[in-house]
Amino acid sequence: MKLNEIKDNEGSTHSRKRLGRGIGSGSGKTGGRGVKGQKSRSGVAINGFEGGQMPIYRRLPKRGFNNIFASDFVVVSLARIQAAIDAGKLDAKATVDAAALKAAGVIRRTKDGVRVLADGELKAKITIVVAGASKPAVEKIEKAGGTVTLLSAPAAAE
């Protein structure tokens, strides 16, 4: 057997049906869709319609709500901060805050502030000013000889 002798098994491939190409083709006019009705039209399915059965989105109860006042923090790991310091994008001696992280390309936007999580290790001694930090993250930063200052959340508009 040679590469040029390889072919598909008999009957494993089918040529595409060209629908609606005249009565002589055997699948002209209605093209195998039957006559009239919703299913004969293009774009058949109505999303969420289950043929008269009560659809799942109506069978299940409504639950919860979206809090429009919820704070949306940008999450940054210690590993990402350390990587930025190692790459020379972030100055460990200067104060690390949201603006510095954005300038270094660690985060894209500040949203409601930055929250630091303890994922990874931190070797550098840094002074960090952020909106939030997890307890393990604060412990790791202080263990490395750094300090953490948490910004108070802005008061809700009266």
UniProtKB/Swiss-Prot annotation:
Keyword RNA-binding attached: yes
Comp. bias regions, Gly residues: 21-35
Domain of life: Bacteria
InterPro entries xrefs: Ribosomal_uL15, Ribosomal_uL15/eL18, Ribosomal_uL15/eL18_sf, Ribosomal_uL15_bac-type, Ribosomal_uL15_CS
Keyword Repressor: no
One example GO MF annotation: rRNA binding
Keywords: Ribonucleoprotein, Ribosomal protein, RNA-binding, rRNA-binding
Residue ranges, annotated region (Disordered): 1-45
Composition bias type Basic and acidic residues, residue spans: 1-13
Reported function: Binds to the 23S rRNA.
NCBIfam families with a match to the protein in the record: rplO_bact (TIGR01071)
Record note on quaternary structure: Part of the 50S ribosomal subunit.
Entry similarity comment: Belongs to the universal ribosomal protein uL15 family.
Protein name in UniProt: Large ribosomal subunit protein uL15
